[in-house]
Amino acid sequence: MCIRDSVITTNTYAIVPFHIGEDRYEDQGGALLELAAKLARDAADSVPREVQVAASVPPMFGSYLPEQFEVQGARRMMLQFRRYLAPVADIFVGETLGSVAEATTYLDVFSDCAADLWLSVTLEDRDPVDGAPRLRSGEPLSELLLSIEGMRFDALLFNCSQPEVMNDAVCISRAELEAFTAQHGAARPMIGAYANAFPLMDEEYEASNASVHQLRQDITPEAYLRYAEQWVESGAEIIGGCCGITPGHIELLANSLKKAPVTMPDYA
């Protein structure tokens, strides 16, 4: 498992106009980012062991809505995230990114930051094809892997998708990244997964923050552990939980896997 024992994420996922509105974002966005950074750093420093802070960089135009992505507007907002979160960040993690354009824009904006750089994408899980994972945009994972070859990232993760679709993505990414890094004499980026416990979203659910979602009752801590063990067997070094994965799930992961996983809750 990963060398890091504990990671918390900043509570910054919702500090974008999609969630808080354009006016509030313009008036208070910077102050909210600064406050979230302070709270996360204070929490990490309050315990007698090393806890790293991962600065959460969300989709700039809403979760599961890659068609709304616009490069220049995204860059402007991402630069604000970088400005306010860099002082506390051990890691930057772009989370729930749903298209090649979202992913490559994020990597470009944060390419020269001092913190580790993690890229986490969300996978299409409504109509998956075995052995051919796709991003929420419908673009093949293979296209993303080709597009980010040569770009800087320290970990590639998959999040906020059903656990059933994660293993194919882990397997394919491991093979492709190992082939590329071996050819260039570089170390392979880490690979990880942190799934959600949502039921399948239909097309009407695409405004994923318009309501409170029900959770799957079958994703118990024990069931989630079985998925996680499969991901580890396939080469994942970072394991955590996204929406609907509780502290109880994470506790069982930490106690059951050989080393404590990196845990990725959606809040600090």
Q: In which residue ranges do the predicted regions lie?
A:
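Domain-level signal for soluble alpha/beta catalytic cores
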Residues: 4-268
